[in-house]
């Protein structure tokens, strides 16, 4: 499956999901609001990493915005 099949969620069911790893991504380019293009780019990077690790679900954590750079840690899972 491609990255369009990866779900961004706020929590997972430990009984239904297997932890596949995590990845930290960052995007340069300041955005005044978290819902801007930079966030979309960041989420796309997380979804791409999930596909590489055979995952289909990601949780975003440790989101930071500093000096025009946004970064986040994505936890990757394969869920049934």
Protein language model regions, located:
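Short glycine/serine/proline-enriched coil/turn segments at secondary-structure junctions
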Residues: 15, 66-68
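Compositionally biased P/S/T/G-rich terminal and signal peptide-adjacent segments
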Residues: 1-26
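Short, well-ordered alpha-helical segments
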Residues: 20-66
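Amphipathic beta-strand/beta-sheet edge segments enriched in Tyr/Trp
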Residues: 70-80
């Amino acid at each position: 499956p491609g990255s369009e099949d990866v779900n961004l969620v706020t929590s997972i069911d430990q009984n239904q999901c297997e932890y596949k790893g995590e990845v930290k991504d960052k995007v340069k380019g300041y955005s005044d609001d978290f819902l801007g293009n930079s966030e979309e780019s960041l989420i796309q990077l997380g979804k791409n990493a999930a596909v590489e690790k055979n995952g289909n679900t990601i949780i975003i954590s440790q989101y930071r915005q500093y000096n025009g750079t946004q970064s986040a840690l994505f936890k990757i899972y394969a869920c049934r």
